[in-house]
Amino acid sequence: MGRTANEPLGRVALGKYLVTGVAGFIGRSIAAELLKRGESVRGIDSFITGKRTNLAGLEAMEFIEGDLADPAACVKVCDGVEIVFHEAALASVPRSVADPVGTNVNCVDATLNLLVAARDAGVRRVVYAGSSSVYGDTPTLPKTEEMLPNPISPYAVAKLAGEHYLRAFFRVYGLETVTLRYFNVFGPHQDPTSHYSGVLAIFCRKMLAGEQPTIYGDGEQSRDFTYIDNVVHANLLAAAAPSGKVAGQMMNMATGKRITLNDTFEVLRELTGYNGKPAYAPERAGDIRDSLADISLAEGLLGYKPIVDFREGLRRTVEWYRASGAE
């Protein structure tokens, strides 16, 4: 029997769990939960997109400032590590359209460097932050792992390349790898200030400040928004699951439900007290129309079930931004 996500993950002699992109939204959340459970954690971030303020509360973690595009940095952070949670990336479709080369360096090159270092250091398992963007704009819903990927943005191409590298390293070198294809993750600590931020973070900041948010397109596009606690839960399950069940696998990570951006705006209007209407602008290059995950594979392999639904997650998110002064 494997460990559950609520049990200690265990340690090798040197006892490190590495979180890449630890100053980012998802990486910070995973590290915080590991520390809460008494685990020994090492984190790395280059602060290209990560925020130093996100390291507050993680003082028990060993932190290394470095760039995974540098192979030497990867060697340093993988020493003595058993499990890697690889969250570092330039996680933005619009940014990848503006800077495809930078996206490739910080997603593909960085991932390959990390995998080589992990293999050489004897790391047991790498859990990878995949992306639903690899499915592209195919009309079939829900998205299943058996569907042929059809990436339509440089970011999606980069994340898919990472998936293939992970699977190759498992098959060729025996490095255990698990890919979780995230669907529109949101929650506390997500940066609401950048043009490249997630839509819910931007909406929360603007609506709490009484500013008009912008919907790109007609607003009838839909997303399977996934609250951060569900993603952290899934990562811990993926780290603890028996090798025979998950090594070399990739699976969707979402709630299995979708909502349009127009309906999302209405929920946020209720939660924030915003009285205006959204602005509408032309669709952005690289954006997909609809997104909905089939999560049955994660349910079967990990025992995963969403632990926080969309509306409750959005309520918690709004309250966090309100308390943190996002207005």
Identify the residue ranges that each predicted region occupies.
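C-terminal substrate-binding subdomain of Rossmann-fold SDR/epimerase-dehydratase oxidoreductases
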Residues: 6-9, 207-327
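Hydrophobic alpha-helix immediately C-terminal to the catalytic Tyr-X-X-X-Lys motif of short-chain
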Residues: 161, 165, 169, 199, ...
